[in-house]
């Protein structure tokens, strides 16, 4: 673990991303290798640094959002550390609310720095 609680393995950093059904479908179409382009009005891509925070978002936000299909998935993936070194970690709340802010125009380069596949490690559904 580094000072931000994300796991590092050599030159890789493990990141997480909470997503809804539509975004997961688009990721699966890439062969679980890339995130889809941001939509208009979404200038930033937000991967998070720990599973706890990703789970919170997937469970508390995605499951209450019609655009997410009322389901939240937690994804795990590895990114080359030398690419991430160009971005600062942003703390957006509690000590676990840590994320990178990747400009939409850098998402293609971000995807090129993913090593391996994007894994679905959990899902949460609206129980109401």
Language-model segments: which ranges?
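Conserved NAD+-utilizing ADP-ribose enzyme module
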Residues: 1-46, 52-128
């Amino acid at each position: 673990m580094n000072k931000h609680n994300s796991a590092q393995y050599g030159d890789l950093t493990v990141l997480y991303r909470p997503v809804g059904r539509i975004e997961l479908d688009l990721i699966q179409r890439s062969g679980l290798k890339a995130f889809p382009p941001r939509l208009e009005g979404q200038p930033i891509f937000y991967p998070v640094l720990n599973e706890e925070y990703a789970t919170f978002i997937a469970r508390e936000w995605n499951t209450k959002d019609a655009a997410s299909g009322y389901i939240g998935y937690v994804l795990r993936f590895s990114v080359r550390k030398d690419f991430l070194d160009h971005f600062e970690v942003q703390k957006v709340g509690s000590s676990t609310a840590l994320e990178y802010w990747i400009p939409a125009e850098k998402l293609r380069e971000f995807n090129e720095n993913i090593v391996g596949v994007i894994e679905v490690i959990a899902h949460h559904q609206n129980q109401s």
